[in-house]
């Protein structure tokens, strides 16, 4: 159990760093992020978005990333305490929804490296390089789910559940 908690801590630190760093760049309306936004809307949806409008949206998204970072930090504190309400929150259904959102958002932003340009190759390597942006929260989602299964009624483990459903 402690080993999973340590892994959870490391993954939370990685996700916090990812979302905080990207959030700060977005709040600053980083030129690359604005170009990814306008390029994706043009190539995928056929909608031309002005640079000013894109910069406003990118900044708003940056603040949302910072909010996610704050929630992830609360989860980290709870996980480190290993007891109490914050600990329960770190593995709650709400936490799982946040991890699912973060994984989806991480994938979409990584994929924007491909969609903004419109060519799959060689831009696909930019997506591959950014796999941790979505895989860190996906791993957290898995561990939170595993934790909930392990602590459900009767102390069932994920292996027990899978074994029961396979027969």
What residue ranges belong to the model's regions?
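Membrane-interface extramembranous regions
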Residues: 1-167
């Amino acid at each position: 159990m402690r080993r999973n908690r340590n892994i959870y801590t490391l993954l939370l630190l990685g996700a916090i760093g990812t979302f905080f760093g990207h959030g700060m760049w977005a709040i600053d309306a980083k030129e690359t992020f604005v170009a990814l936004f306008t390029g994706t809307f043009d190539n995928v949806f056929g909608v031309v978005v002005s640079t000013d409008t894109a910069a406003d949206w990118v900044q708003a998204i940056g603040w949302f990333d910072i909010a996610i970072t704050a929630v992830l930090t609360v989860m980290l504190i709870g996980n480190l305490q290993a007891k109490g309400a914050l600990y329960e929150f770190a593995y709650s259904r709400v936490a799982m929804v946040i991890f699912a959102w973060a994984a989806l958002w991480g994938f979409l932003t990584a994929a924007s490296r491909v969609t903004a340009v419109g060519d799959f190759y060689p831009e696909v390597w930019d997506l591959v390089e950014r796999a941790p942006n979505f895989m860190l929260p996906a791993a957290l989602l898995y561990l939170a789910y595993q934790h909930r299964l392990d602590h459900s009624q009767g102390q069932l483990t994920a292996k027990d559940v899978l074994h029961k459903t396979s027969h």
